[in-house]
From Swiss-Prot:
Record-stated family: Belongs to the class-I aminoacyl-tRNA synthetase family.
Record key words, sorted: Acetylation, Aminoacyl-tRNA synthetase, ATP-binding, Cytoplasm, Ligase, Nucleotide-binding, Phosphoprotein, Protein biosynthesis
Compartment list: Cytoplasm, Cytosol; Cytoplasm
EC class (word): ligase
Subunit structure: Monomer. Part of a multisubunit complex that groups tRNA ligases for Arg (RARS1), Asp (DARS1), Gln (QARS1), Ile (IARS1), Leu (LARS1), Lys (KARS1), Met (MARS1) the bifunctional ligase for Glu and Pro (EPRS1) and the auxiliary subunits AIMP1/p43, AIMP2/p38 and EEF1E1/p18. Interacts with RARS1. Part of a complex composed of RARS1, QARS1 and AIMP1.
Binding site residues for ATP: 271-273, 277-283, 457, 486-487, 494-496
Protein name: Glutamine--tRNA ligase
Modified residues (Phosphoserine): S70, S495
Entry's Gene Ontology cellular component terms: aminoacyl-tRNA synthetase multienzyme complex; cytoplasm; cytosol
Motif interval(s): 'KMSKS' region: 493-497
UniProt-listed PROSITE patterns: AA_TRNA_LIGASE_I
EC number(s) on file: 6.1.1.18
């Protein structure tokens, strides 16, 4: 139908021309509305009143199953459904009863068909509602919430027409109160809401304080905003748009509920061929978090169907990272646990003429329009014999595959279900020489484990049709697959292949190099798991792909470490300072608070002797305007000591370089307060400190338009600076790998696993404040 004809058809339903044009832009909606209007005209003629047109538009815009369109249009045109309330009930009924035939008697009862609500009943219901609120209504008059009266009347008369209820409320209120006065016409003053008491479950909005991003945490339920809040209840899979039903669906769902008891079940299914990265953290939080928020369970299932790329170290590392983020799987499973069942189902698929053995080579299947398989229609018995021959090792790799008979969303035809691989499996050894593919394994493992919500990233959307098709082809329980947007970061690469290239090029040490965004790297750098979880919560779960700035993740890190990392003092570029009038014959013991803002968290003790070390940058012989630290005629305080030092003599070497300072000291309360207090160390430990910056110079190192030479050409030469002879106070002497500290005025640091009894090694996790140049 031409656009002008459709426009005329839609305006004939009572739509404004603007609304009709907007509707035409939505191809799915316009097609369904066109069909509904055409069917209605066959009964009512070309003239359709606006009330009926409104119902038809509501039907077309909200109906998920086009098979029910004619059925519902007939109820609208016959006036059996004549209110919005009835239409909503009808749509809910067909959504909850996806299989034929519809029980019309039950349907009509649920939708109020034939129920007549008289004006007298409406009058009585409104009168009863007004009487319940009469006293308050007389006081507040027209400032009273009339919606409350209409809501109570509607609750008493479910199938009453909403417009009639509103009209009756208006009439009775006017009769009780009389016409509106000038006071009634004044706007009701807004009452400021009382500020709720602070709780642990805060919102995830960013608060900017003094130019810094302060990130607040979220509860699990607050994380699951957006589309996730619309998820189906267990057993109501058929209510999900696009879910495919068969005559067996309802029986299978009943069996599913008998097994699970209506429990929410999710799974996190990584491939054990690499290390998890920040994007996986979102998937872990979503799957485990959604299950936990709904009192459900989450499986950790290793998709170990490609023995060529799997290594034992990856299984261990993945499990460790899940635990590190604070989650405990209900059960750890493996796709290989189900190899026998998967094989039996593959045989059954062939018997049902839904799969066949194919001899096209891998290169023949690549590209956008590969040739159809000449073996697609081979006899069932022949495919059964050949598939058994595949299992027995009678074909070389690439000579035969088992393919499923379906076309996927992206146009890919007949995806491979099994292929030959003569590689021993880490769990099953040489038992198998054929292995199932992801397209075949994923949905069936979900079915076996009775997963209720199969949560995947958007790249798997093209495989949703094969997911539903395969479960239904075998008549097994079919879970719901739901896709969400990936989480990516600027200035990062997370591809396993590209990380291996970085390692091979010597740009990073290994998968856990602190400049990477793998979870093992972030842990080594000192990122707390709570910060990563908070970051994932802040990002939320949406359908759109999300690319975030690293400084937002770092803000989450600061937020956690500020409350959890005890303070210590360290000097990166030491300058010796000798106090010539030190007030004691031996070092003083100074009590330093672990957390200056909360001294109830305890203290640690550091020595303060006649020789201390300060940062070289905290002294200048010729300071520029605004410089507040140590200089001639400008004393400075030493943090936590209660003392102020003043320059007495500068000791220089043969080259003129400052080697040490001689100063005098006085009590801080014995004179004018200095302009600044600096950190220091005395009788310190020598340590190595590694200072990290971004690994790449551009936001999108993989984008050829931004980095024509490829990501390896975009490496930041200053991404790592090693300070081999830094000094740190002795309070950290017993620190263990991954212990975290705030080195005052320097940043947050974590003990690196390279540390040994002879020397500690610290990684700078983040600076105290974000560098404005990075934001």
């Amino acid at each position: 139908m031409a656009a002008l004809d459709s426009l005329s058809l839609f305006t004939g339903l009572g739509l404004s021309e603007q609304k009709a044009r907007e509707t035409l832009k939505n191809t799915v909606l316009s097609a369904q509305l066109r069909e509904a209007a055409t069917q209605a005209q066959q009964t009512l003629g070309s003239s359709i009143d606006k009330a009926t047109g409104t119902l038809l538009y509501g039907l077309a815009s909200r109906l998920r199953d086009p098979r029910r369109l004619s059925f519902l249009v007939s109820y609208i045109t016959s006036r059996k459904i004549h209110t919005e309330t009835q239409l909503s009930a009808a749509l809910e009924y067909v959504r909850s009863h996806p299989l034929d035939p519809i029980n019309t008697e039950d349907f009509e009862q649920e939708c109020g068909v034939g129920v007549v609500v008289t004006p007298e009943q409406i009058e009585e219901a409104v009168e009863a509602a007004i009487n319940r609120h009469r006293a308050k209504l007389l006081v507040e008059r027209y400032h009273f919430s009339m919606g409350l009266l209409m809501g109570e009347a509607r609750a008493a008369l479910k199938w009453a027409d909403g417009k009639m209820i509103k009209h009756e409320v208006d009439m009775q209120v006017l009769h009780l109160l009389g016409p509106k006065t000038e006071t009634d016409l004044e706007k009701k003053p807004k009452v400021a809401k009382a500020r709720p008491e602070e709780t642990d479950q805060r919102t995830a909005k960013d608060v900017v304080e003094n130019g810094e991003v302060v990130v607040q945490t979220l509860s699990l339920m607050e994380q699951l905003r957006g589309e996730a809040l619309k998820f189906h209840k267990p057993g109501e899979n058929y209510k999900t748009p696009g879910y495919v039903t068969t005559p067996h669906t309802m029986d299978l769902l009943k069996q599913h509920l008998d097994i699970t008891g209506g429990q929410v079940r999710t799974r996190f299914p990584p491939e054990p061929n690499g290390i998890l990265h920040i994007g996986h953290a979102k998937a872990i939080n979503f799957n485990f978090g959604y299950a936990k928020a709904n009192n459900g369970i989450c499986f950790l299932r290793f998709d170990d169907t490609n023995p060529e790329k799997e290594e034992a170290k990856f299984f261990t590392a993945i499990y460790d990272m899940v635990a590190w983020l604070g989650y405990t799987p209900y059960k750890v499973t493996y796709a290989s646990d189900y190899f026998d069942q998967l094989y039996a189902w593959a045989v059954e698929l062939i018997r049902r003429d839904q799969a066949y053995v194919c001899h096209q080579r891998g290169e023949e299947l690549k590209g956008h329009n590969p040739l159809p398989s000449p073996w697609r229609d081979r006899p069932i018995e022949e495919s059964l014999l050949l598939f058994e021959a595949m299992r027995k090792g009678k074909f070389a790799e690439g000579e035969a595959t088992l393919r499923m008979k379906l076309v996927m969303e992206d146009g890919k035809m007949d995806p491979v279900a099994y292929r030959v691989k003569y590689t021993p499996h880490h769990r099953t050894g040489d038992t198998w020489c054929i292995y199932p593919t992801y397209d075949y394994t994923h949905c069936l493992c979900d079915s076996i484990e009775h997963i209720t919500h199969s949560l995947c990233t958007k790249e798997f959307q093209a495989r949703r049709s094969s997911y539903f098709w395969l479960c239904n082809a075998l008549d097994v329980y079919c879970p719901v697959q739901w896709e969400y947007g990936r989480l990516n970061l600027h200035y990062a690469v997370v591809s396993k292949r590209k990380i291996l290239q970085l390692v091979a090029a010597g740009a990073v040490r290994d998968w856990d190099d602190p400049r990477l965004f793998t979870l093992t790297a972030l842990r080594r750098r000192g990122f707390p798991p709570e910060a990563i979880n908070n970051f994932c919560a802040r990002v939320g779960v949406t359908v759109a792909q999300t690319t975030m700035e690293p400084h937002l993740l770092e803000a989450c890190v600061r937020d956690v470490l500020n409350d959890t990392a005890p303070r210590a003092m360290a000097v990166l570029e030491p300058l010796q300072v000798v106090i010539t009038n030190f007030p004691a014959t031996k070092a003083l013991d100074i009590q330093v608070p672990n957390f200056p803002a909360d001294e109830t968290k305890g203290f640690h003790q550091v020595p303060f002797g006649s020789t201390v070390f300060i940062e070289r940058m905290d002294f200048k012989e010729e300071p520029e305007p605004g410089y507040k630290r140590l200089a001639w005629g400008q004393p400075v305080g030493l943090r936590h000591t209660g003392y102020v030092i003043e320059l007495q003599h500068v000791v220089k070497g043969p080259s003129g370089c400052v080697e040490s300072l001689k100063v005098t000291c006085r009590r801080a309360d014995a004179g004018e307060k200095p302009k600044a207090f600096i950190h220091w160390v005395s009788q310190p430990l020598t340590c190595e400190i590694r200072l990290y910056e971004r690994l790449f110079q551009h936001k999108n190192p993989e984008d050829p338009a931004e980095v024509p030479g490829g990501f390896l050409s975009d490496l930041n030469p200053a991404s790592l600076q090693v300070v081999e002879a830094a000094l740190v106070d002795c309070s950290v002497a017993l620190a263990k790998p991954f212990d975290k500290f705030q080195f005052e005025r320097l940043g947050y640091f974590s003990v690196d696993p390279d540390s040994n009894q002879g020397q500690l090694v610290f990684n700078r996790t983040v600076t105290l404040k974000e560098d404005p140049g990075k934001v």
